[in-house]
Amino acid sequence: MAGVNEIRSKYLEFFRAQGHEVVASGPLVPNNDPTLLFTNAGMVPFKNVFTGQETRPYKRAASSQKCVRAGGKHNDLDNVGYTARHHTFFEMLGNFSFGDYYKAEAIEFAWDLITKELALPESRLMVTIYEDDDEAHGLWKKITGLSDDKIVRLGAKSNFWQMGDTGPCGPNSEIFYDHGDKIPGGPPGSPDEDGDRFIEIWNLVFMQYEQHEDGSRTRLPKPSIDTGMGLERIAAVLQGTHDNYSTDLMRSLIVASAEASKSDPDGPHAVSHRVIADHLRSSSFLLADGVMPSNEGRGYVLRRIMRRAMRHAQLVGVAEPLMWRLVPALVRQMGDAYPELRRAEALVTETLRLEETRFRETLTRGLKLLDEEIESLGGKGVLAGEVAFKLYDTYGFPLDLTQDALRSRGMSVDQTGFDEAMAKQRQDARAAWSGSGEKATEAVWFELRDKVGATEFLGYESEIAEGKVVALLVDGQPVDKVEAGTDAALITNQTPFYAESGGQVGDTGIVFSADGAEFPVIDTMKKLGALHVHIGKLARGTLKLGDIVEMKVDKSLRDATRANHSATHLLHEALRRVLGDHVTQKGSMVGPERLRFDFSHPKPMTPEEISEVETIVNRVIRQNAEVTTRLMTPEDAIAAGALALFGEKYGEEVRVLAMGLDDENPNGTYSVELCGGTHVRRVGDIAIFKIVSESAVASGIRRIEALTGEGARAYLVAQDRIAKEAASALRISTEDLPARVVSLMEERKRLERELAQAKKQLAMSGGGGSGGQESPVQEFGGVKLIARKLEGVNPKDLRGLIDESKKQLGSGVVVLVAISEDGKGAIAVGVTDDLTSRYNAVELVKAGAAAMGGKGGGGRPDMAQAGGPEAEKADAALDAVKAAVGELAGAA
């Protein structure tokens, strides 16, 4: 029986032998289509090739593409675990022709692979075609020998494929496998086609038309082929099961979940193990591709998936985080086919562990609220939308998690009510938003780009250049001229000013004309990826369209920014070497004063790791090697070892920066990255690198702030001065300073403990007041009572003092009011065990707390405590408890 990994390899090798380029899977976050949440089909990485916007050095390709469907139009999340074929993560096998072969070859390849390489019996196969595609009908009969009843004509809904409202489109053929009459269901096109007997295993799309805006279609000059075969589906067929979760790969993950939770994989929690197995795959691959859990966008979808799996882990009865313990099992199964998963194993493991640990407590509280609401409904009916929204807003419960919890009880959610609550929150948020301050609309920038074209950037070679004024804007609107004293935006045909992008701030400087106009530039922005927009206020003279101007970048600030930007490249590589290959850049800010670098890592760096990173970067800086730049295609650059930043969009040609020398690297270079920013000429120009902070930005994302050059030198001088001043004040050497600080901290803690103990002793001996009574012990109806007001005592010490007082009394009631040094009040009541049937400490403490402006109080019948914001009413609180005790004593 062929395993999933063997089937994947066999598919790719078959098409390699047919002259196809075997292309590695693209990332789950598509870098060529901002409209897609995740890559959800095998053709997504090739979309621009099909439309002609991109060319590749091959005309035939085959791939096994990672896909996720868990949000937006394609959302399988709710059904995962309950059905045989729904997944959030799946692999799509595909072969593609870009104007090379067409229908005949596509059908022949598919039939040969299925019937010869995979050895499926022809008697179990049937196909569908588009109802008007006589050509496909003839080819299927000729190539396969299928009878007419095995070639089913269907309408456009199922057998005509379109990329969108416009663009390439065409008929498609689907190949179905018949599981046999022991499984209910009918053939495609029949009334009961939704049964499980006939399963689609391969879809062949024949792209032969161009769809136009008016609805008309014209034939493409070079028709293409796009096919897709779900690996999980074909594996199920080849392994003799109609359930994808019974295949060897999925079964291994289900068994791993069951073993880790000490439960039966096929018992009452079978659905939960299926959910965990599926969601482990999607969560792990999304994390490996750079998506981190968050409260918006792709990160929120990831968090929904993770939390749904975590809720099912709780249903199984696992008390500790589970998913992170299953990552090694997943890597064993899929790490060879997808090396990025193996590289990111540490990041995936730690992120899952942290996310589940944080969610556990919230999950418990949220489920308690949900159980209470279900109980109030008698365990049936519809949960109110506002309750579902509260679970979402307060406890982080995605709606589908709540729906999933209700599903097993036969209940549902008021979706309309939930949507209304969500809409109200968004409306409130919009009302509170003051706006971005952006004056020029996007329409203006589009018009200008079409009119004047892209700005040519000359700043790599020089900080000074001549330009022609091609656009002026005041208050976001184009004008013909600008007078002195006016805030304006200036666009020239070419510029040495770097526009803010890639994390690097825009250049500043000055622009002036021959007739005396001076325009100080305070910022440079990039619009539509093409226009360099210089922002400032005209200091003198007049600027007009068509003027020739001299443009000078502030060289000192540019040089400082260069150093910081180059340092981020050295830092990135050092982090990967010290922490692991899972480190990827998640954001940066590079300015003249400092640099900020955000990166994926699941936990704080240790002081030793920070020191090692600094050492590596400064060692490379001291080499003073030349920084080299080459222009290449993105594909060639990455193939040559350049590091591309996740999520960054690259054009047809990119700058490849190589920095530093490294004997360990095959090409002898320390760092190679794609980057369009400005950089130093030699790494020695950075001078020195110093990390000043390392902190958390979000779950799984850390931030380093650092200084270079003069900024780093000034920082070190200041730190040295502070250390020397502190050492001088303590009359020790700077070398002894750390040990002395530790000693002083320990001494302070000891003195604080002694002071607290002395205060308690003083208070209990009567020095802290006793509520106006000379003797601390009073009697009410034969019941002894101690009532004290304790000044300067920490409320957290009340429990111990209550216990001591109860021992002193033997039998009775104790009430203590503590007033801490910050003026906050707290009251505690203790009742000895022999009296708890008559006096309840919780009820007594509520009476005292109310007198001090407090509400409630919690504890046990023998000990209870509450807060009291009005500490000045401490005596009244003591009197209130005395009165309550007196009443109960009298009643007895």
UniProtKB/Swiss-Prot annotation:
Where Zn(2+) binds, per the record, is at: 565, 569, 675, 679
Q: Which cofactor does it need?
A: Zn(2+)
Main localization of the protein? Answer: cytoplasm
Cofactor binding mode, per the note? Binds 1 zinc ion per subunit.
Top-tier EC class: ligase
The residues forming the signal peptide are none
Instruction: Offer one Pfam family short name for this entry.
Output: tRNA_SAD
Q: What is its EC number?
A: 6.1.1.7
Instruction: List the protein's name.
Output: Alanine--tRNA ligase
> What organism, scientifically named, is this protein from?
Parvibaculum lavamentivorans (strain DS-1 / DSM 13023 / NCIMB 13966)
